[in-house]
Amino acid sequence: MKIRPLNDRLLVKRLAEEEKTAGGIIIPDSAKEKPAEGQVVAVGPGKVSDSGERVALQVKEGDLVLFSKYGGTDVKLDGEDFLIMREDDILGIME
């Protein structure tokens, strides 16, 4: 199934969670925090301004982004977990 985000929304796939600490301790699933980093899979056409013009998004498909831990809505597509979020939930683009 494909999904096309609307307006200023993005479809983001979280980066893989860490399985071990730097010291080699295996982290159980119950203690793992959801990563706040991901890759943008799809972007909407942009936000509509007050004047009626569409404003393009700064984030592009393929960008690695840092986002708020509590931002976005979890969705499951074809057995994979994704987030749908607004561009405002993105804290920065990683380079």
Swiss-Prot record:
GO MF annotation list: ATP binding; metal ion binding; protein folding chaperone; protein-folding chaperone binding; unfolded protein binding
CDD domains associated with the record: cpn10
Chief localization: cytoplasm
InterPro entries in alphabetical order: Chaperonin_GroES (IPR020818), Chaperonin_GroES_sf (IPR037124), Chaprnonin_Cpn10_CS (IPR018369), GroES-like_sf (IPR011032)
Location in or out of the cell: Cytoplasm
Record keywords, A-Z: Chaperone, Cytoplasm
Any GO CC annotation of this UniProt entry: cytoplasm
Keyword set includes Iron: no
GO BP terms, alphabetized: chaperone cofactor-dependent protein refolding
SMART domains listed in its UniProt record: Cpn10
Job of this protein: Together with the chaperonin GroEL, plays an essential role in assisting protein folding. The GroEL-GroES system forms a nano-cage that allows encapsulation of the non-native substrate proteins and provides a physical environment optimized to promote and accelerate protein folding. GroES binds to the apical surface of the GroEL ring, thereby capping the opening of the GroEL channel.
Family in the record: Belongs to the GroES chaperonin family.
Assembly information from the UniProt record: Heptamer of 7 subunits arranged in a ring. Interacts with the chaperonin GroEL.
UniProt protein name: Co-chaperonin GroES
Gene name for this UniProt entry: groES
